[in-house]
């Protein structure tokens, strides 16, 4: 009987974590939506590449700094109320974004989407620390990351189809209505309370949470681990989430559908690779080896995609899939962040790790847009205002412009591989 109760408890835990992961997948779809709507958004809001990068990256201006308070709030208040409220905020932000032609109002909508999304990933990991065994954390972070990329794949393929048929406004409004339904599902399905066989690290006071944050933030290993995650994740935060589809269309001559498919194959590789990397890391009780291997191979693949001319569509698709498969080792950093920190501050530790990881999107998405405009200006001698002529959007930038603007991605990934030599091996063991 006791064994059966344990199995039932474990099943409930996985289902609850799955609901949280569903919200993460939903917010991920909202995150990458601008990448499949580039032309429509630039026409609607009259944007240059710099402006397009800025309006997308506003998401991160809320998402990144919110990670620290989100971690403390998760430890203090639990995931149920916070994830439900966060989903509702995403819905409001989406409606605000689609209901205006003003850049700043739209940017405010993206900010709200980022604000709500900030709770998603950390919320799932917090649910895992409450409901699942500690030795499953790397696998849970991998599975959660995988479900997030399912949202990205849906965005790259189905959103592109709906945008073509219905327009971007109706398409995003449909996602907002789905978010309303999801809000009720989260409230009814998620439970915070720890069960009989598992103890949660809930922080009893905000003051204690701030003390824990101070301890964690002073741990240099947390920053090394987070910086690895940030740099090896650049193919997602900078390339696939925003600039991947425009690059594949402009530089390799792929159609909108072909570019979306190739981009989604990167997410598919990550979807399959993240839980496998987590399982492999848990099984061998080592973190650094899969992190080093994944970052090293992914760096080579990124260089080939960016700097090898004459790639046909099939080659690009295979390379994108393999890139996603290998850099999915990034998902391990959340387990490492937990294992480098005391158990009562699990949410805070993983939130700080996630904040560092997502800095890449906040800082570098708009930088790519600026570098594209700057490279075009140097090459053509034309004013950046030319970029506002929508008919010229797909003629402005050539492969050289993109190679210059995206060069820091493989450089950053190479640095990530080197950082593993400065990271402590936790052997998949977390302090209590």
Label each residue range with its predicted role.
Residues 88-101, 296-310:
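C-terminal ends and interior cores of transmembrane alpha-helices
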Residues 76-86, 282-296:
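Cytoplasmic membrane-interface "Motif A"-like loop-to-helix N-cap segments
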Residues 46, 78, 99-105, 133, ...:
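Helix-breaking motifs and short loop linkers at transmembrane-helix boundaries and internal kinks
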Residues 2-9, 193-226:
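Juxtamembrane intracellular "pre-TM" segments in multi-pass secondary transporters
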Residues 65-104:
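Conserved MFS/SLC helix-loop-helix module at the cytosolic interface between two early adjacent transmembrane helices
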């Amino acid at each position: 009987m006791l064994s059966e109760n344990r199995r039932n408890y474990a099943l409930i835990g996985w289902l609850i974590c799955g609901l949280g992961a569903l919200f993460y997948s939903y917010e991920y779809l909202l995150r990458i939506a601008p990448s499949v709507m580039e032309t429509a958004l630039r026409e609607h809001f009259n944007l240059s590449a710099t402006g397009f990068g800025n309006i997308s990256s506003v998401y991160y201006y809320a998402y990144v700094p919110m990670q620290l308070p989100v971690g403390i709030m998760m430890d203090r208040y639990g995931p149920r109320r916070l994830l439900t409220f966060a989903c509702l905020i995403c819905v409001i932000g989406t409606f605000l974004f689609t209901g205006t032609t003003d850049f700043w109002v739209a940017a405010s909508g993206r900010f709200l989407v980022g604000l709500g999304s900030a709770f998603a990933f950390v919320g799932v990991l917090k649910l895992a620390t409450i409901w699942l065994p500690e030795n499953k954390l790397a696998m849970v972070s991998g599975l959660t990351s995988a479900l997030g990329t399912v949202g990205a794949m849906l965005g790259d393929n189905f959103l592109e189809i709906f945008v073509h048929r219905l327009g971007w406004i109706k398409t995003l409004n449909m996602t907002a209505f789905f978010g309303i339904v999801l809000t009720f599902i989260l409230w009814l399905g998620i439970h915070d309370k720890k069960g009989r066989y598992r103890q949660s690290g809930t922080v009893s006071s905000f003051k204690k949470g701030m003390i824990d944050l101070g301890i964690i933030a002073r741990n240099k290993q947390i920053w090394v681990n987070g910086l690895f995650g940030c740099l090896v994740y650049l193919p997602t935060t900078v390339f696939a989430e925003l600039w991947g589809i425009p690059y594949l269309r402009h530089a390799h001559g792929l159609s909108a559908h072909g570019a979306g498919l190739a981009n989604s194959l990167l997410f598919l590789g990550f979807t399959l690779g993240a839980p496998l990397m987590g399982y492999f890391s848990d099984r061998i009780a080592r973190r650094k080896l899969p992190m080093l291997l994944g970052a090293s191979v992914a760096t080579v693949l990124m260089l080939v995609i960016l700097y090898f001319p004459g790639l046909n569509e099939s080659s690009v698709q295979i390379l994108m899939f393999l890139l996603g498969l290998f850099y999915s080792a990034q998902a391990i950093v959340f387990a490492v962040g937990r294992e480098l920190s005391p158990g009562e501050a699990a949410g805070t530790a993983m939130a700080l790790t996630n904040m560092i990881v997502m800095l890449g999107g906040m800082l570098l998405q708009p930088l790519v847009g600026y570098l594209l405009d700057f490279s075009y200006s140097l090459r053509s001698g034309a004013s950046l205002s030319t970029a506002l002529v929508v008919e010229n959007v797909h003629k402005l930038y050539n492969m050289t412009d993109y190679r210059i603007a995206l060069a820091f991605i493989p450089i950053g990934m190479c640095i990530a591989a080197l950082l593993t030599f400065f990271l402590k091996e936790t052997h998949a063991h977390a302090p209590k």
